[in-house]
Amino acid sequence: MTKGIGKLKKIVYPRAGGVETIQIVESEDPSPAKGEVCVRVHRAGVNFAELMMRQGLYGSSPDYPFTPGYETAGEVIGMGEGVDSLKKGDRVIAMTGFGGYAEKVCLDARRAVKIPDSVSFDKAAAIPVTYGTSYHMLVHLGRMVRGETVLIHHAAGGVGTAVAQICNALGASLVIGTASAPKRDFVESLGMRFVDREGEDFVDVCKNLTEGKGVHHAIDPVGGEHLLRSYKSLRKGGKLYYFGASAAVKGNRRSRISEFRMWWGMPRFDPLKLMSSNKAVFGVHMGLLEDESVFNGHLDALSR
């Protein structure tokens, strides 16, 4: 086993709150346990999930204080007992879940995947959460094929951008992206049909652009009543993917009122109606995906 030496710096959320709560602290170097690797972190991704963790809205977060950081890219500097899939010096991307905002992090070796030398750490650190989630939804769950249509909410965000790129690669015939007006040019630069989320009804747009049928796939990170409207945008046989709860977040601090409104407005889907319309509703949370073979397959495909 590789023993920890010296100290490292890491970011800590000591309690729920605004950005003023963020701390940088020193701690002992970690030592990889059996089945783990230790990674020197070169880059770490910043996601909406980390914002929700700080505000106390992320249900699977550890108790405070804790170190956030869902995804990292770096090099292996140590292995615990029984690890033979990786070696010192390997360049990897890793789904850390928590703890990634540190100079070094130990994690289950099955959640670290080697990357080619041609892929920079800058790019690699953005793969696990945004592109992993997008790939899992459209390719693994949705089995998307050329010519299908897609609705993307928060289209200018990390997952929205990744979904749009995957749609283009898979040959989608129409990609509709909702966002605020200032983001129109960016959304359209990715090949999407822009919908102003404040001034247009995306359900009507989806129906009008598909001869009244609706889209094949709808990507919703909002929740609440918004999720039901996304469902109404689907055609028969369509698929809805729910992977976030942005409706619960307003500004830089936790809002109990926003949380209540989101959960109160959550739809209840009738299995009989799902069956009769051949529709599907998926809940997606890559951080809680327990099948490492699926997860690693996604990362391996995306990093090449």
Report residues per predicted region.
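NAD(P)H dinucleotide-binding glycine-rich loop of Rossmann-like/cofactor-binding domains
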Residues: R40, M52, D63, R91-H154
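Short glycine/proline-centered loop/turn elements that form peptide/ligand docking sites
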Residues: G80-S85, G177-F186, E198, G224-H226, ...
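Local beta-strand N-terminus motif with an aromatic residue
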Residues: G89, G147, G191, G214-V215
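Glycine-rich phosphate-binding loop and adjacent beta-alpha segment
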Residues: A172, E225-S303
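A glycine-rich helix->loop->beta "capping" turn
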Residues: L209-H217
